[in-house]
Amino acid sequence: MGCGHVGLVTGGCLAAIGHHVICADRDAERIRLLQEGRLPLYEPHLNELILRTSADGSLTFTADAAGALRSADAIFLCIGVPQLENGESDFAALDSAAIQIAHAVDSPKLIVERSTVPVKTGEQLKHLLRVTTPSSRADFRVAANPQFLREGTAVDDFFHPERVLLGLDDAESEATLRQIYAPILQQDFHCPIHAESCPPRKLPELLLASVRSAELIKQASNAFLAVKISYANVLADLCERLGGDVQEVTHAVGLDPRIRPSFLQAGIGFGGERLPKDLRAFCKLLEAEGVDAAIPKAAEHVNLARTEIFFQKTERSLWVLKHKKIALLGLSHKAATDDIRSSPAIDLYKRLTAAGALVTAFDPQAISNAHAAFPGLVSCRDAYEAAERADALLILTEWDEFRVLDWPRIRGIMARPLVLDGRNLLSPHYMKSLGFEYHSVGRPD
């Protein structure tokens, strides 16, 4: 249930490893698009996966979930729990799905939490299902199977995970989920995203926990990743004051096997729908339970300051922003996605336009979503059009194609050869050799 990013990746991948999957969503227009073979979001390999599994009948879509719910062996809830303005969790969509299940089914069912949910959600679901279901019609088991899918690599993350986490309170649920995930756990399936068989991969570790522990593991994991990113950004600020190079520092620190290099990249901060929300939810959980939330709160504070720091760096470089033409390369919160939710690039776009700058933008995938949110956005067909006669060019998303642009050409078409690299994508030595004034994050100018 739910045809967003998590639901489509989970449904498409489960269908690809041999299961019959029905994806249900109350958004009839979204279902219509999916039935026509049109994906409403960008995720590498997902479109071909959906088309292939839809064509062979292993994956279908419906806006009327009742029949699918009755015939299902397991019901995966791929429905997020957003936050209200006051920081409280909004369970409306999840509760609505639970009520729909309770009214539709007439036999015992396994309900699986797939999207990230607050701790104790499983118990709330059980209670809601019990009080909503007509007496003696059905018995429900609730399990947690948190997803660890990164936007941009989600399909590969599903097929080749480091671990599969199952939160369980009964043996029957464990048996069902072991059977569902057997091809993944054994790495015994034809990989649909490679022309030939997949290269050998290490078998994923199966982790069994209680439902409550599994819910906590997911929140704690995301909060820790946020702390690592913010720690790298604190190091970047320190390097700028001391004349050090944050990439040299984080590379050396990350070689320690106790730390590892992932998520130690300095820049303009993290965004997206999940990490900021999960960090706030984790802080709120700690406070509610009387536990010191200083560390995750500090990570949130550091992250919220990143775009202001980069905005000030841009302002110092240009002196006056009003009427200056500024080109933005990248609008999505990270590469390989069209997701602009909580994107640092979007925050900078709003700050720059509010200051009177004339902003042009290019993103390989996120322009449509950006236009929907900001109809006045001046978008360009490529990076060169965006850079033409620009007083400054800001790199805000780490798209690989930005690394290999014809930078001498861009040098020739800009009004002023000023580049501010918010993702440390380019070599300072190379850019300066071309005659650019080049500033990045935590590296010597």
Cite the ranges covered by each PLM segment:
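Structural/interface elements that position substrates and couple domains in central-metabolism enzymes
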Residues: 1-445
